[in-house]
């Protein structure tokens, strides 16, 4: 069955859809989950690792948008069985056999405790690759049989670090995101036709999240202002809602002709390194 060319009367709407957003308890994931609910998603699962209070707070906001069912699932992207376990719990908790939208947002970035590239160990390398590439791929594989007959959406949150030179402690993180970009493109080529689904990544630039704040601690001065001036054409750093709006577009019928893409979400990236020098 080819990707539909039928014109929708409300291509922006996600009314009645079911979605899973990993890492949806805070930051970008939280903003994505809330935005999907506002666009009409009916059933929504978010994941968290340890902070149940943040997950419950996110669900409270999501339910204010009129969602029918919202659940939080504890899931660790360093767990080898995260894909199988998460999707099984989501299907049961949401009382559904279909997941229309999968957003892989959860990621591992710990520049304070990650060794620089010249000191990287196999353990460090494997941990980042497992969290940022294997985990989302395994979640996609577990979700694949439960995508709808047409119009499924798989959206992976990546980073500009996958495409730029990076400071020493972020090199392996960038490599793990580049691997995810590659997997996403290949999945679009391999499965888009049979699944009539789209597979895209959103390459996020500097955005004010917990991870961004952690990175900022490594550098002196007014880091965020320097990033805004040196990294982006806009005079500010991104906020989670900036990313959520792009994901909402890709998840809707409006984004149906984008497949295998890495969508830049960076406010007009200038240079990768000047703010860090």
Curated annotation (Swiss-Prot):
Pathway(s) where this gene product acts: Secondary metabolite biosynthesis; Alkaloid biosynthesis; Mycotoxin biosynthesis
The entry's keywords: NADP, Oxidoreductase
InterPro entries: NAD(P)-bd_dom_sf, Sc_DH/Rdtase_CS, SDR_fam
Keyword Cell wall biogenesis/degradation recorded: no
Signal peptide: none
Molecular-function GO term, any one: oxidoreductase activity, acting on CH-OH group of donors
CDD domains in the cross-refs: SDR_c
Enzyme class: oxidoreductase
Keyword field contains NADP: yes
EC number: 1.1.1.-
Catalytic center residues: 158 (proton donor), 159 (proton donor), 173 (proton acceptor), 177 (lowers pka of active site tyr)
Sequence positions that bind NADP(+): 28, 76, 105, 173, 177, 209
PROSITE patterns linked: ADH_SHORT (PS00061)
Reaction(s) catalysed (UniProt annotation): yaequinolone D + NADPH + H(+) = penigequinolone A + NADP(+) + H2O; yaequinolone D + NADPH + H(+) = penigequinolone B + NADP(+) + H2O
GO biological process per UniProt: secondary metabolite biosynthetic process
Family affiliation: Belongs to the short-chain dehydrogenases/reductases (SDR) family.
Function: Short chain dehydrogenase; part of the gene cluster that mediates the biosynthesis of penigequinolones, potent insecticidal alkaloids that contain a highly modified 10-carbon prenyl group. The first stage is catalyzed by the nonribosomal peptide synthetase penN that condenses anthranilic acid and O-methyl-L-tyrosine to produce 4'-methoxycyclopeptin. 4'-methoxycyclopeptin is then converted to 4'-methoxydehydrocyclopeptin by the ketoglutarate-dependent dioxygenase penM through dehydrogenation to form a double bond between C-alpha and C-beta of the O-methyltyrosine side chain.
Protein's recorded name: Short chain dehydrogenase penD
Gene name tied to this protein: penD
